[in-house]
A protein has these predicted regions:
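Short beta-strand/loop element within the Bergerat-fold HATPase_c
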Residues: 77-89
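A conserved beta-strand-to-alpha-helix junction within the catalytic ATP-binding
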Residues: 13-27, 86
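Conserved catalytic submotifs in the C-terminal HATPase_c
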Residues: 35, 40-50
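Short alpha-helical Gxxx[C/S/T] motif in the catalytic ATP-binding
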Residues: 125, 129
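Conserved micro-motifs of the catalytic ATP-binding
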Residues: 9-12, 51-54, 117
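Short conserved segment of the HATPase_c
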Residues: 102-114, 169
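Detector for a conserved hydrophobic position within an alpha-helical segment of the HATPase_c
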Residues: 133-134
Length: 178
């Protein structure tokens, strides 16, 4: 049931949410795996609190998949950094690990359904991440070097697509009256 819910697209329930709350709750869900490998999760938040217009449950699913991949990739007694911040147009979150990394020839395929390099798993985790982030008007970037680690960056618009459209229409209306 949880598996089918994860792969079947649902309409996001958009609300203004604190991105850090979503990430911290996801980290708590992964606590057993983190403790089993003695991994230190280090949160690095920017000065301003990043808010996202999004569906908290869907975003938790995205971070659950990304953080799970990082946990799988790193050796015992290592660290995973989760960095959040805001730039001019976007709220971003990065999950940084120094694990096994992704081979250069595999990088173009990570969002494809059923693509996996793991012995276990279904190869749909990053496909789901990509879909969720895209449904939120954002994008996912992956920077990885084999045997050196991976940085997964999620970027979300600071304003929802609907809000940007309204603002754009208001600006056009102002230009027409002058």
């Amino acid at each position: 049931s949880h598996f089918l819910k994860a792969i079947r697209p649902t309409t996001p329930d958009f609300k203004k949410i604190k991105l850090l709350d979503v990430i911290e709750e996801t980290v708590r869900l992964k606590e057993r795996e983190v403790n089993a490998k003695n991994i230190n999760i280090r949160m690095e938040a920017g000065v301003r609190e990043p808010f996202v217009n999004g569906d908290a449950e869907q975003l938790k699913q995205a971070f659950f998949n990304i953080i799970g991949n990082a946990i799988d990739a790193v050796p015992e007694n290592s660290e995973i950094r989760i960095i959040t911040g805001i730039d001019s147009d976007h709220v971003f979150a990065q999950v940084v690990d120094q694990g096994t990394g992704i081979r250069k020839e595999d990088l173009p395929h990570v969002f494809e359904p059923y693509f996996t390099t793991k012995k276990e798993g279904h190869g749909i985790g990053m496909m789901i991440v990509h879909r969720i982030v895209r449904d939120h008007g954002g994008d996912v970037g992956i920077d990885s070097k084999q045997d050196a680690g991976t940085i997964v960056t999620l970027r979300f618009p600071r304003k929802s697509p609907r809000h940007r459209l309204l603002e754009s229409n208001e600006l056009q209306g102002e230009n027409q009256t002058k």
